[in-house]
C-alpha cells in the first residue's frame, strides 16, 4: 500500500466499484506464467495493482490486476476455485495453479507480499456471509477431468467397458421353438368344423342326459393313451392307422361295464344326483386344456379325428367322477356349513349391535335426567341474578316518581310520597345518616351552616321529618337518589358501600365549591354563605332532565371543583430534566424545584442519575479495528 498514492487508489476504486466488490487487500505486482514450458517462467507483460476482491454479485473471491498506468481497468482476473492453494516460493514470489498452467506473482515490496499472503490464506475472515455459504463455487476443471477419468462409469449401455454384455441376452432355447411349430400345423384340417359341430352336440347331449351318459364314453381314454404313446414315437405314420384305431372302439364296452356300475353307485352314494353331472359338465366346458396340455393328447387330436374329439369331453367326467363324489359332499357340507356358519356370525354381530342402542338410550336417558336436573338448578341459578335487571328496568320509574313527588307534595300527599321514597332508598339512608352526623360536626366547628345543612340533610330528613322545605327536597332527592339507584341496580350487596361513598362528596362539594385551590376542610367555612346562591343555582340546574342531574351528581361525587389543584404556571413551560440534558442545559433549577416539592424529589434524583449515565455513555467511543487496512477501502 505504501507504493500506491491517492490517485492510484481512485483508479482502483473506479475499476472495482464498491457496490459489487469488497476489496480485501491491494499491492503492486507482476504476472508470470509457466507456459508453454512448465519449467520456465514467462513474463506476460501485465503489471499493476493486484487486488484480492470478494465479488458480492457472484459471492466468490477473485484476484484482479488493475492497470494504474493507463485507463484499461481490470486487465486480468482469476477466480479462486474450490480448494485454491496459494504458495510462497520466495518471499517476493508467490505461485498458484490455473487451468492450463501455473501462474506467479512478483512483488515489489516484501512486506506487502507477506501481508498479501496472509490475506489470501485467511480470506474467509474477511468474506461476506453469502460468500461463505456459497455452494456453487467453481472447481478447477483440470482436477475435475482427472477425477472423471479415474472413475469407471457403468451405464446401461456400457458396451465399450463390457464387450460381451450383449451376449448375455442370447437365448439357447431355439430348438424347442421348431418342435412346437411342427406339432401345431396338424389341427387346421377341415375336421375342426366337424369338431365344433360335434362338440356342440356333445355338450347338448351331456346336458340332456343323466349321470349314465357321461360314463359310457369314459373308458375311451385308457385304450387311447397307450396308442398315443406308440404313435408319438412315429408321428409320421400316425395318419394311416386312423381307420385301425376305430376298431378298438368295441373293446371299450368291455371296460364300460365297471364304470356303468360305478355310475349308478355314485348317484346312490350321493343323495343329490343332479349337481354331480352339472359339475363335470362345467369343468369340461370351462377346462378343455387338461387334455391338450400333455403333448401326447395334443398329437392324438388330429390323428383320432372325430371320435376322439367327441370323447375328450366325457373323459373328464371319468376322471372327475371318481374325485367328484367327494367334492359334492364338500360343497354340500361347505354350502350347509356356509349357510349355517354365516347364520351364526350375524347373530353375534347383531348381538353387539343391540348393546350400543341401550348404551345410547341409557346415556340419553341419563343425559336427559342429568341434564334436566342440571338445567333446573342452572335455571334457578340464572333466575337468582335475574332480579337485578328489574331495577335496571325500573331506573326510569324512580325518576318518574321523583318527578311526581313534588306534585304529591303540592297536593299535600306527603305520606304517600314518603312511602315511595322509603321503598326506593331503604338501604342507603343508614350511611347517609352517618355522614350527616359528620356534617353537623363540621358545620358546628365552622359556623353558619344553617342554610346548606338542610339542603344536605334533606335526604334523611324526608325519611324522618316530612314537613321540611317542600320544593327543594324533591330536587335534592332526585339528585341524591339517582346516583344511588344507578349503582344499586347491578350489585345489591355493594349498595351500602357505594351509597356510603356517594353521600360524603356532596357536603365536600358544598363546602369546597367556592374554593379553587384549598384542599383541606377548614378554609371553606367563612365562604359558606356564598353556597346559598350557588345552591340556588344548583337547584335551578337540577330541574332539567334526569341524565344531566345524574352527571352533575357524579361530578359532585368525585369531589367537584374542590378536587382540582393549582399548578404553578411557571413550571409548565419548563422542560423535563432529560430534555434539558439533551439540549445541553443545566438541570440544577428544575432539580431544585423538584426537591422543593415532596412528590417531585425522587423523580428528580432518578432523572439526574439517568442523565449522568447518558452523559457517561456519550463520552465513551468504541474503537473499531478493521484489521489494520479496511478503512482505506
Swiss-Prot record:
Record domain WH2: where:
547-567
Q: Where is the composition biased (Polar residues)?
A: 363-376, 399-414, 454-465
Superkingdom as given in the UniProt entry: Eukaryota
Q: Which InterPro entries does this chain map to?
A: PH-like_dom_sf, WASPfam_EVH1, WH1/EVH1_dom, WH2_dom
> What are the disulfide bonds?
none
Task: Extract one GO BP annotation from the record.
Answer: positive regulation of actin filament bundle assembly
User: Which keywords describe this protein according to UniProt?
Assistant: Phosphoprotein
Q: Which GO terms describe its cellular component?
A: actin cortical patch; cytoplasm; mating projection tip; SLAC complex
Q: What Gene Ontology molecular-function terms does this entry list? A: actin binding; Arp2/3 complex binding; small GTPase binding
Give residue spans, biased composition: Low complexity.
Answer: 192-215, 257-269, 307-322, 479-488
For bias kind Pro residues, which ranges apply? 216-225, 238-256, 342-357
Ranges for the region named Disordered are: 145-545, 563-606
Key word Phosphoprotein present: yes
**Residues modified as Phosphothreonine:** 334
Residues found modified as Phosphoserine: 337, 588
- Annotated WH1 domain ranges read 16-127
Q: How would you summarize the oligomeric state and partners of this protein?
A: Interacts with KRE6, LSB3, LSB5 and YSC84.
Something else known = Present with 8580 molecules/cell in log phase SD medium.
Name the chain's protein. Answer: Proline-rich protein LAS17
The taxonomic lineage of its organism, from the top, reads: Eukaryota, Fungi, Dikarya, Ascomycota, Saccharomycotina
Amino acid at each position: 500500500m505504501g507504493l500506491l498514492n491517492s490517485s492510484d487508489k481512485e483508479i482502483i476504486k473506479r475499476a472495482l466499484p464498491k457496490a459489487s466488490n469488497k476489496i480485501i487487500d491491494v499491492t503492486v505486482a507482476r504476472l508470470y506464467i509457466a507456459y508453454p514450458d512448465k519449467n520456465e517462467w514467462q513474463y506476460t507483460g501485465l503489471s499493476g495493482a493486484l487486488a484480492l476482491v470478494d465479488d458480492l454479485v457472484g459471492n466468490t473471491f477473485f484476484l484482479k490486476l488493475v492497470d494504474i498506468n493507463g485507463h484499461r481497468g481490470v486487465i486480468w482476473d482469476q477466480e479462486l476455485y474450490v480448494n485454491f492453494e496459494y504458495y510462497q516460493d520466495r518471499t517476493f514470489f508467490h505461485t498458484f495453479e490455473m487451468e492450463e498452467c501455473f501462474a506467479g506473482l512478483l512483488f515489489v515490496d516484501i512486506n506487502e507480499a507477506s501481508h498479501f499472503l496472509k490475506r489470501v490464506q485467511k480470506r474467509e475472515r474477511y468474506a461476506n456471509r453469502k460468500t461463505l455459504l456459497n455452494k456453487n463455487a467453481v472447481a478447477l476443471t483440470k482436477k475435475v477431468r482427472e477425477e472423471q477419468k479415474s472413475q469407471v462409469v457403468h451405464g446401461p449401455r456400457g458396451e465399450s467397458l463390457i464387450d460381451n454384455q450383449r451376449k448375455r441376452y442370447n437365448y439357447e432355447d431355439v430348438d424347442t421353438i421348431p418342435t412346437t411349430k411342427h406339432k401345431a400345423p396338424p389341427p387346421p384340417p377341415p375336421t375342426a368344423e366337424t369338431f365344433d359341430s360335434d362338440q356342440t352336440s356333445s355338450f347338448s347331449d351331456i346336458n340332456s342326459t343323466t349321470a349314465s351318459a357321461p360314463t359310457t364314453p369314459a373308458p375311451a381314454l385308457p385304450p387311447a393313451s397307450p396308442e398315443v404313446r406308440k404313435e408319438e414315437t412315429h408321428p409320421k405314420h400316425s395318419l394311416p392307422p386312423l381307420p385301425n384305431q376305430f376298431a378298438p372302439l368295441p373293446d371299450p364296452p368291455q371296460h364300460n361295464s365297471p364304470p356303468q356300475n360305478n355310475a349308478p353307485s355314485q348317484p346312490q352314494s350321493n343323495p343329490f344326483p343332479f349337481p354331480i353331472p352339472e359339475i363335470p359338465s362345467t369343468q369340461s366346458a370351462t377346462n378343455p386344456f387338461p387334455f391338450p396340455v400333455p403333448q401326447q393328447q395334443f398329437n392324438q387330436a388330429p390323428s383320432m379325428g372325430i371320435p376322439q374329439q367327441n370323447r375328450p369331453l366325457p373323459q373328464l367326467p371319468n376322471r372327475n367322477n371318481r374325485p367328484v363324489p367327494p367334492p359334492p359332499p364338500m360343497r354340500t357340507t361347505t354350502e350347509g356349513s356356509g349357510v349355517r356358519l354365516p347364520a351364526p356370525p350375524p347373530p353375534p354381530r347383531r348381538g353387539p349391535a343391540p348393546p350400543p342402542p341401550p348404551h345410547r338410550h341409557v346415556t340419553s336417558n341419563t343425559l336427559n335426567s342429568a341434564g334436566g336436573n342440571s338445567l333446573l338448578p342452572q335455571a334457578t341459578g340464572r333466575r337468582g341474578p335475574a332480579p337485578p335487571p328489574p331495577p335496571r328496568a325500573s331506573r326510569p320509574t324512580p325518576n318518574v316518581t321523583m318527578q311526581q313527588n313534588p306534585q304529591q307534595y303540592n297536593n299535600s300527599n306527603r305520606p304517600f310520597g314518603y312511602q315511595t321514597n322509603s321503598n326506593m332508598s331503604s338501604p342507603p339512608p343508614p350511611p347517609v345518616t352517618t355522614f350527616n352526623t359528620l356534617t353537623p360536626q363540621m358545620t358546628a366547628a365552622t359556623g353558619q351552616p344553617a342554610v346548606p345543612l338542610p339542603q344536605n340533610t334533606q335526604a334523611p330528613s324526608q325519611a324522618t321529618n316530612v314537613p321540611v322545605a317542600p320544593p327543594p327536597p324533591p330536587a335534592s332527592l332526585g339528585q341524591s337518589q339517582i346516583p344511588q339507584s344507578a349503582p344499586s341496580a347491578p350489585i345489591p350487596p355493594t349498595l351500602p358501600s357505594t351509597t356510603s361513598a356517594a353521600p360524603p362528596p356532596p357536603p365536600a362539594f358544598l363546602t369546597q365549591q367556592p374554593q379553587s385551590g384549598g384542599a383541606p376542610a377548614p378554609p371553606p367555612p367563612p365562604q359558606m354563605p356564598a353556597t346559598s346562591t350557588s345552591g340556588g343555582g344548583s337547584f335551578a340546574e337540577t330541574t332539567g332532565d334526569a341524565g344531566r342531574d345524574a352527571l352533575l351528581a357524579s361530578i359532585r361525587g368525585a369531589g367537584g371543583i374542590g378536587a382540582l389543584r393549582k399548578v404553578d404556571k411557571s413550571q409548565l413551560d419548563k422542560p423535563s430534566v432529560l430534555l434539558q440534558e439533551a439540549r445541553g442545559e443545566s438541570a440544577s433549577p428544575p432539580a431544585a424545584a423538584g426537591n422543593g416539592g415532596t412528590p417531585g424529589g425522587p423523580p428528580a434524583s432518578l432523572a439526574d442519575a439517568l442523565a449522568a449515565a447518558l452523559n457517561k455513555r456519550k463520552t465513551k467511543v468504541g474503537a473499531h479495528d478493521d484489521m489494520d487496512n479496511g478503512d482505506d477501502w
